[in-house]
Amino acid sequence: VIFLIILLMASLSLVGLSIKGATAKASQETFKNITNSFSMQINRRVNQGTPRGAGNIKGEDIKKITENKAIESYVKRINAIGDLTGYELIETPDTKKNLTPDRAKHFGSSLMITGVNDSSKEDKFVSGSYKLVEGEHLTNDDKDKILMHKDLAAKHGWKVGDKVKLDSNVYDADNEKGAKETVEVTIKGLFDGHNKSAVTYSQELYENTAITDIHTAAKLYGYTEDT
């Protein structure tokens, strides 16, 4: 099962699936300048989605949709959690206050991952919340690649071209298969952007989010791009 958002482009058309929180707000900004668009979501009367409330459209179904000749291009998205095992995240005084010993043990190095096949059309980049400041955007041909926040990279001395490892998190509710995967990814680019309001947990900070290719995000949950 793939957890995602699809953007179908016909003169830059967009289809969004399971848009939540800040992503939903960014997506609303995106829609302002997009025409010929329509949206699709799972039917929550018969499909409640993932434990954390995301959609779960299968990759094989996406393929059927995108075979329509009227669709010029598309963007699909997978939300995941990936651990930078052994490395600390960016913290603020507020997030430190909420970092209990139990949370630190289970999620102390957990990045919020968005897997996407075209990062230039990812909501937060389109809305301006994120800005690529070094390197290149992810494309459909990328595999084992990541875009990382420049502040997190600077904290650990990482630069474009360096390799880092992401581990599955067995405590993540959406890791329903209990996957224990490790994916070595190459930093393809660095982005900037900061929250405009206070946050409770470190994973809500833009600095602790990352964009990867679809393959990487899916593998962290024990899936492939098509399942």
Q: Which residues does each PLM region occupy?
A:
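Alpha-helical transmembrane segments of integral membrane proteins
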Residues: 2-12
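Alpha-helical transmembrane segments
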Residues: 10-41
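Basic-flanked hydrophobic alpha-helices used for secretion and membrane insertion
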Residues: 32-75, 79-227
